[in-house]
From Swiss-Prot:
Database matches in InterPro entries: ATP_synth_F1_ATPase_gsu (IPR035968), ATP_synth_F1_gsu (IPR000131)
Organism: Wolinella succinogenes (strain ATCC 29543 / DSM 1740 / CCUG 13145 / JCM 31913 / LMG 7466 / NCTC 11488 / FDC 602W)
Protein name: ATP synthase gamma chain
Family matches, as Pfam families: ATP-synt
Lineage: Bacteria, Pseudomonadati, Campylobacterota, Epsilonproteobacteria, Campylobacterales
Top-level lineage group: Bacteria
Cell compartment(s), UniProt: Cell inner membrane
Molecular function as annotated in GO: ATP binding; proton-transporting ATP synthase activity, rotational mechanism
Signal peptide annotation: none
SS bonds (residue pairs): none
Record's bilayer topology term: Peripheral membrane protein
Amino acid sequence: MGSNLKEIRKKITSVKNTQKTTKAMKLVSTSKLKKAEEMAKRSRVYAERITAVFQEIKAKIEQNGFSGLESPYFTAGEDREVKMVDIVFVTADKGLCGGFNSTTIKEVTRLMAEYKSQNVKVRLRAIGKKGISFFGFNEVELLDKVSDLSATPDYERAAEFVNKATTDFINGVTDKVILVHNGFKNMISQELKVQDLLPIKADAIEAKESLGMMEVEPSEQEREILDQLAKKYIEFNMYYALIDSLAAEHSARMQAMDAASNNAGELVKSLTIAYNKARQEAITTELVEINTGVESMK
């Protein structure tokens, strides 16, 4: 009985230590989530501005007789048969965040199966150790991969990564580029986001209001202007996806650690009850043995 009590005490101590760790991780994730949210807010302001500039210049150029759809960035899907698709996806470098990573991985796997059934080839470009590890373990080839970027979003590195997919699209190597990530919805939920990155859809860059920009004069550089803006638009979408994913990751981890802490608390209560019961039984047994010994001596 004594050894049983010792085992229960060890378990209680172990669970309490785990609970301390999960509580600490929750606090860290809460702090990091706030920082990621601030990054996302600042980025949204920039996103609105670049979208407005993009749309206004595109509209003014079209008024001068240039159709944006002539640009390879805007090539309509129905005018270009889809034979090869690049899927760019973001996962975290770490786990302990519930189903955050598996949600993205499942969607990428689903898209692969869907395109395969249509005889469309798919290439994967992965950001994040969890996604890289999963597809590597399952012997699925990754055309491009990078770690430590999802944990520390950097515009230059994000642009460098996505520009490889953009170049292949412009050169006709691929016919479509899809961006998949698990994004931030609110403090307690995440939202799977699947975006057709290329070709750019006209409705994806509708500006809410005019910026009152100067007129764009007709010139041979019109397409170059629009293409440069399109390139920046793609780069920023990649960068924002990293920030959005980071906020969602910390939100998911905060929830997971909160749930783990609560579960640990319940387990400690259960083990404490078991310990007290075992201790009471041990005391009762000792009393019975003492009484039996006393009776035998009479």
